[in-house]
Amino acid sequence: LQKSKYKVCGYVTDVEGNMDYFNKYVKISKILEWTCEKKNRLKFKKNDSIFIYGGDTQDRGDSDIRFVNILLKFKEDYPERVIFIIGNRDANKLRIPSEISEKYSNYQNFLKKYDNYPYWEDKSVRITLRKYLKDNNYDLNIKNRLKYIVERTMGNKDGFEKRRVELSIILKKNINNISDNDVISSFLNSVLPKPKNITQSNDNYMLKYLMQGQLVHIFGEHIFVHGAINEKNIGKIPKNKNTIEDIHIWAKEINNWFHKELKEYMKNPKDGGITKKRKAHNIINYAVPGYNKDITIVYADNLKNGNGVHINKNVIEHLNKYGIKNIITGHKPHGDCPLVIRDKNLTAISADTSYSNINYLKNIKDDKYYNDKRGKAVSEVLLYSNGDIRVHGILADNSKYGYIIKKNKKSPSSSDYIGLQLNNNYWVKNFKNNKYLISFGKGFDIDEKWVNLQELKKLLKKL
């Protein structure tokens, strides 16, 4: 392994345009802080650290543009020390130009093309453009097509109007003076090589993020992807039947593949509609579920029906062979603190906590956070060049926590149990006040309970 000149990496993921959450993260962060009270520019606290953003910058909050611009400025100030991982909510924005630019002469023929779209969704839950327009009594026009794309197929509820609000804030204009065309231009400009009407919307901030992003990054013994590394995708490059053995070469080659495809897209971003002819098709296809028997690292996960699963033994051996001992990901939420999955030779951490507000999930409306899926919870994962991992943050009940997983521990510690699966299939997720948080996921529901060491040891005994 090439020795890094940096000691520690700070990691957060899946902010999804939620500046309230990112502010909470900066407040607890050990490695970065705001430069001033305006909270629009970041700096490192020390010279020995780097920062990795784990992907998914967009869609769920009200600050998509502002959040990415903060990240871009941070990378401009520290180009070597700030790394962007590309998530599905980042890559899928390349769909917008070709889908809203497509012309049609026959209404019914145009809708018919969309009757099997989105192709990555099961027919039982798929909402087609035809159904969306009918259910909402909408006309077929660019505005409603964009609303369908953003709000229905990208999961950005009220995304069109949220963008209008954000533009009014950025441009310092009355919201009534932000037109539908301004909003359309905003989404379109975000991924165009040559954005237009910038003064009334924004520039190509998302394209800039993608141009500077990576699908894979390696820091010491830690490897970062948005989704997961498994037996289906390790060493795989899209459109290439060969498997790359060396993990470091694979990381380089899959990043090269992405940027080659992105350059092709930039030559002609608007043509092709929803067909395979559009230049971004390969990237779009790679960042959706079910791609080519799930060889994607962007949309994979370490869950089965919402609960953690052990990392494949062959994957562990393969990663270990090339000096990798930890996989750091986001993508799929799991409670109000990161999910840790440990084998004696590898630790996998999934740090997406975007569904951490239990009251929201249960729709309890007497909690002031009921309309916020995140609530009070926030976390930071710190990865050290010596292989150690530190996780700290605030839980949904507003209590603080923190633990360290040491690579070369000389004596037992309370964190030794974190990341183990119990005989009732619960995972040990946290430690606080001499008790352990154990958790079982089912879909987006999480059953959690605190147990003492004696209770934990009983659950660790083989049946």
Report the location of each language-model feature.
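Feature recognizes metal-dependent phosphohydrolase scaffolds
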Residues: 1-463
